[in-house]
Amino acid sequence: MNEALINDLRLAGYEVNTNGIGLTQIEGNGFILEYEFSQWWLYANYGELIEYVDQFDSLDAALGAANLMKCLKLIHPLCFKIGLQIL
């Protein structure tokens, strides 16, 4: 990931870091994205509980799903998985 993209993500309000095992990690409100095996892995972040949701080929698709997940959580905390299965 290049420095310009990292800066753009940070300007958009995301936290971009490298985790303890060296994977690129992007955190937003209620989600975590990690890049591993040429895939972006989306996790729901409930504070103390982190749950796998899905994986994506592109960062744009992963961020889109993360934002959809965030919107669906506002409607009802349990329905975001139903929405992601439709994708």
From Swiss-Prot:
Pfam families xrefs: DUF5495
Source organism, top-level taxon: Viruses
UniProt name for this protein: Uncharacterized 9.8 kDa protein in Gp55-nrdG intergenic region
Name of the encoding gene: y04A
